[in-house]
Amino acid sequence: MQRQKKQEMRAAAFYDLEGTLVSTNLVHTLGFYAQRQQGLLKTITKSAKTLAKIPLFAATDLYSRNVFNQVFFKSYEGESEDRLRYFSNELFEEVLKPAVFPGTFTLLEKSKKNGLRQVAITGALDFSVAPLLEYLGIEDFVANRLEFVNGYATGRLLPPVMASATKARWIREFAEREGISLSDSYAYSDSISDLPMLSIVGYPAAVNPDFRLKQTALQHDWAILNLK
């Protein structure tokens, strides 16, 4: 009976997004929104504050992805939900679509031909990446979600916050719910912070990897891909 269940299970391909399939990161999205404030003075002020915070973002990301999320998404505090969602298609056309790596479509096409369910797990905001994922043909995804009160962002994320071990936990729960065999599945990421996610599938791949992830991939004989 267990063997029959195993045969019926499907496999999936789990993708990180920023740095893996596209060259942009969370700061590019924040910068885009900072330049689209109501009024010139507010736009200049918000853009300057965003630029000034980049060293802080980099430092906290090296220390802890969870701390980074707390600091980074605080920058959205006070933003109108309607405006953020309104500009999401413009964000896609002007920033995200041109940033898709040349090899991304080849990887996705091969994965789909192999019958793998396509799933993205990203630390970006849900509304900001939805048009991109539709363009890439990735129907299943989980992303971070801002908390809004009376139509304005509080600067806090709703749980679960997609980062590091949380991504791996979400994948396990998704696989259990959807009948996905993780031992037959693939995972793709560029960052060592996604090591938990890469470690739970049968076929992990380091894509455009940072130094630490590349060394880990070499030690474990994982696939190393360059989509740039």
Feature-to-residue mapping (PLM):
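C-terminal cap/substrate-recognition subdomain and adjoining C-terminal extension
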Residues: Q2-R10, Y86, E93-K228
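Metal-dependent phosphoesterase signature
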Residues: V67-P102
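Electropositive phosphate-/nucleotide-binding environments in soluble metabolic enzymes
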Residues: T24, L62, N66, G78, ...
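Residue-level signal for pocket-adjacent positions within structured domains
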Residues: D16-L17, V71, F141, Y152
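Short acidic (Asp/Glu) patches
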Residues: Q37, L62, P102, T106
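Active-site neighborhood of HAD-like aspartate-dependent phosphohydrolases
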Residues: Q2-T60
